[in-house]
């Protein structure tokens, strides 16, 4: 179709169906290194439309988009992402991603062999990511809006700390990461349901890795966005810590770099021996007995550090300390000294209160 006053310019075009088989797309980063390879077994586009004049940005739409068996090799070969199926329906404003996996390309034992520095080995799976009430355009510019985002995930992170940590820059915080997305987005309601997160680390060759995890994880947020014109994102998180302790935390992620991030919450109650895996791996200490009544905390933080308070209410805490050169043998004198210090602190401060 052509406008009568601009006969030389293409106004719109519509293609009823486009089908692609075995697509490969390669993306190079700013250093001219291959950053990602994406393979699609099949891509189907129905009702594809372009509506544009030279005076305006290119605007394109489609009625439905489906893809199967998507594979993305990324992160410099450390991980592969697969999506079994993706489908977008414009009339329903609905995007559904099925069976999303993040697969490490090397085993836990092989990761240190391929990388001479500390690298997170990530394994993840989501049954589905579902965007409802999805629109892609706002006043001729791309702005992704959704009424609701529903998802679940299982996430395992492993870090071998035997290798040196060669990171020389400060870790980016959530708002900075979100603002790196090329497309602005706003989700009215974010719901993460019945998910799982575990972190495991190996500190010494002669020690077993330590592990902590959070089950029955739920995350809720309203107006979740990467639009820096907004003040912040607020996330409410609940979970079971080590399958035993009830946990509730609220996070505030500001977009203004002059405002600090905030976190506050509590964990109640569980046996402190549940922490033995991570304690022995990190500091060669195991809890012999003792229960946590309540752990509450509130702190502000940024890239450089945190400041806040923690209250640790516990009962009957006794520990064993182990010898560095023989991690399976109890260091008797060190154990006596630590337990005596715990008793003294309990007399001075019935609930251990301190600064973060």
Q: Where in this protein do the model-derived segments appear?
A:
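Extended amphipathic, helix-rich lipid-handling scaffolds
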Residues: 1-27, 43-48, 63-70, 94-136, ...
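Outer-membrane beta-barrel proteins
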Residues: 107, 158-160, 319-323
């Amino acid at each position: 179709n052509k406008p009568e006053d601009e006969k030389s310019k293409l106004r719109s075009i519509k293609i009823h169906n486009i089908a692609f088989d075995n697509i490969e797309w390669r993306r190079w980063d700013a250093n001219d290194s291959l950053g990602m390879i994406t393979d699609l077994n099949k891509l189907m586009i129905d009702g594809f439309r372009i509506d544009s004049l030279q005076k305006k940005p290119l605007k394109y739409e489609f009625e439905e988009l489906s893809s199967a068996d998507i594979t993305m090799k990324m992160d410099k070969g450390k991980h592969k992402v697969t999506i079994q199926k993706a489908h977008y329906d414009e009339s329903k404003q609905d995007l559904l991603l099925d069976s999303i996996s993040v697969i490490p390309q090397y085993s836990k034992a092989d990761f240190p062999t391929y990388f001479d520095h500390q690298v997170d080995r990530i394994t993840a799976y989501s049954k589905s990511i579902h965007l409802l009430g999805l629109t892609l355009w706002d006043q001729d510019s791309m702005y992704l809006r959704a009424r609701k985002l529903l998802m679940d995930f299982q996430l395992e992170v492993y870090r071998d700390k035997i290798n040196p940590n060669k990171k020389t820059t400060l870790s980016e915080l959530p708002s900075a990461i979100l603002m790196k997305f090329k497309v602005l987005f706003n989700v009215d309601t974010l719901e993460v349901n019945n998910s799982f997160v575990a972190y495991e680390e190996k500190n010494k060759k002669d020690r077993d890795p330590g592990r902590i995890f959070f089950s029955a994880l739920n995350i809720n947020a309203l107006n979740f966005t990467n639009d820096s014109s907004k003040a912040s994102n607020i996330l409410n998180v609940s979970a079971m810590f080590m399958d035993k302790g009830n946990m509730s935390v609220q996070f505030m992620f500001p977009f203004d770099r002059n405002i600090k991030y905030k976190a506050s919450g509590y964990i109640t109650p569980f046996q402190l021996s549940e922490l033995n895996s991570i304690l022995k791996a990190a500091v060669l200490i195991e809890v012999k007995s003792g229960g946590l009544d309540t752990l509450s905390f509130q702190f502000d933080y940024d890239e450089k550090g945190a400041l806040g308070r923690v209250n640790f209410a516990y009962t009957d805490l006794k520990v064993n300390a182990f010898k560095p050169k023989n991690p399976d043998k109890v260091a008797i004198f060190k154990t006596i000294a630590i337990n005596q210090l715990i008793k003294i602190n309990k007399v001075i401060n019935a609930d251990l209160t301190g600064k973060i």
